[in-house]
Amino acid sequence: MSHSELLPIPPLHTACDPVNSIEDLRERWRALMGPLSFGTRLLWFGLIGPDRCFALKISRVPIRPRPRGPIVWNLMSSLRTLLDDLEPGTTAALLLSGPGRGSISTIELLWSKSLTDMAARFAVPLEPIFRANDELVALLG
């Protein structure tokens, strides 16, 4: 567990603070996730504008343990369409959440690779991908 995991969960209002580093992004996700306790696997996604702040709406979709092509394809296709209507410099932020404890799993790394590969295919600019379990929020990769 990292030093920042021992710190209190950041208040929710800090989720809209600028993201200027990977650690900032991790802290924004910590604020958005709140107390860590997950019953199902979800993929969370939000947009970070050119001002480097999260948009006010974060979405999530249920996912299976292993990535499925159509789900990843549809997400990236939708994000590309959305980004086409937004200011240049807007990026997508992704977080996988699910029950459990311990270090990053092979399956989580597979999810990260699938998401990254499909994002490249659709030219969706991604922030570093994170994962949250019942113990901590961690950078994937």
Residue positions per predicted region:
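Polybasic/polar functional segments that serve as interface/processing modules
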Residues: M1-G141
